[in-house]
């Protein structure tokens, strides 16, 4: 088993994008042994011209990120968080370097405690 994580980052180093304004998501995969790697750079072209708070827009975002278990962004509103949650995706507002956040999330996941989130 592995987990896919969508990370909102403007610079590829820090988690610093607002979910509704994110231009791309860096997709990482965390393996059962705690190792992780970036597997994709997913563009948010589908967002162009859309309001980040529109319900249809949020549902599109959830569909595009459906293969991800978690979304790590600098900021996220309650509406976006709820739509992602309803689609089985845990959203977390995190302000840290990507590597640090992924290392901590990997430790959490391999401990088996992710089940408390569902």
Model region roles, listed by residue range:
Residues 1-60, 67, 86, 94-118:
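Non-catalytic interface/targeting segments
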